[in-house]
Amino acid sequence: MKIIRDPIHGYIEISDKILQIISTDIFQRLRHISQTGLAYLVYPGMRHTRFEHSLGVMYLVKEFIRYIKINSEGIESLDFLEDDEFIDLVSVAGLLHDIGHLPFSHTFENALSISKEVYGLDVEYYGKKTHVILGSRVIDTYLSHIIDKLFKNFNSVNFIQRVILSTPKTREEKFASSIISSAIDADRSDYLPRDSYFAGVGYGNIDLERLKRSLMYVNDRLVAMKKAIPVIEQFLLSRMYMYQTIYFHSVVGLYNAILSHAISRLIEKDLIPKIDPENYIELNDFLILSKIRESGKEFYDGIVNRRGFKRVKKDVVDSCYKFFEDNRKEINEVMRDSKGLILYHDFYDVPYSEDEIFVYQDDEIKPLSNVSNIISSLRSIKKGVIGYHESVENKLERINNLLKNC
């Protein structure tokens, strides 16, 4: 057994079984995949990676299961939680939920979207599912033989793949999927406090101990006890504040947009390996940064030296956001014609869906929105950021004309 000291969860114990997966080259690669793209250009402490986040999710999966088992006793039959090997398998699914992330995480996925929609390149892009679809293939390529050896009593590889893809077929898979990927899950319960810690802000500081001690699994659904309502409200508000102030910070958006267009250039010029599981070992942040100069001096200076690009001070919000969405074709043309030196980056997030969070109250399962006035007031976040390189400052007529309609 190994023990790792984590700044969020304290000591994390790792069994020799799980260590065999963590020690592989493909998992160690996550040490070199930024958790939050180029957010460190605005919040210098945000240099943490998908590696420690994945360890945190693995730890929380076991913690969640421990308390679900206690709290659900006598209410729901969860015989599969009596099997320690099953619990280990679910924790491995948590460990591997981000194994498919590309360099700079979601920023690379945005680059694939831009490559396809703006520059017309033939790339694999599956929207928000990109990293989990690729991750399923990465597991097949690099880890399936190890997983099969470690978990001989289960169809373990398919179990993990269906869990991380959120396509569960069995009751056990549905249970695992709800713990790893739902409105209140081990994933968000790790990244909110972790990202908050490294950003140096307090928005993501949730009462994690209280939350995990309040979880139950009833009628094949992850629910929280009534007494946890304030904790869930805090959780959702913390998430909203983190999106508003950190993830959707306008300057963070600008630099991630710059990097996205730079990566698109690298893809267009065949300067980085094809996005394929066989090439995943090579694909990390260091590779992209080493190639950035070849995408263009403007992008290199913008990303490495934080020079050259400016942001239009007026963010695109409300009716202006809708106008820009309705005129997306023209905006894409502006970006394409300027070769990425004029940028538009949009943010969109829904805090939660009403059918996602439930509370166990008076022997009934009730939607959180029925018992919380705070939650019903949460709204979607929609905004856009416009940026440009100083060399094209006199070529902003088309963007300025669009802004006049706002």
Residue ranges: model-predicted function:
Residues 1-92, 101-406:
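Histidine-centered, transition-metal-coordinating active-site segments
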